[in-house]
């Protein structure tokens, strides 16, 4: 299943993405982020991380450098202490 999603993202990057001007506000791009997240964390967790990243990619977000966290690194943005 993981390879299917990786193949779909690579297909998007190769055939669909070049048809539109670059608009991603982040580095790495959202599709590259999703690809790396799925490779590193698997389809469910990595896919969820990719979806959250795409939802943050809009004109009202400043964007910038936002790499995929390493395995074991805290990657969720919730407040666990309060």
From Swiss-Prot:
Keywords: Cell inner membrane, Cell membrane, Membrane
A GO CC annotation given for this chain: plasma membrane
Record carries keyword Transmembrane: no
InterPro entries (alphabetical): Membr_insert_effic_factor_YidD
Compartment(s) where it occurs, according to its Swiss-Prot or TrEMBL record: Cell inner membrane
Keyword Ribosomal protein: no
Topology in the lipid bilayer: Peripheral membrane protein
Domain of life: Bacteria
HAMAP family from the UniProt entry: UPF0161_YidD
Family recorded in the similarity comment: Belongs to the UPF0161 family.
Function, as annotated: Could be involved in insertion of integral membrane proteins into the membrane.
Entry protein name: Putative membrane protein insertion efficiency factor
Originating organism: Trichormus variabilis (strain ATCC 29413 / PCC 7937) (Anabaena variabilis)
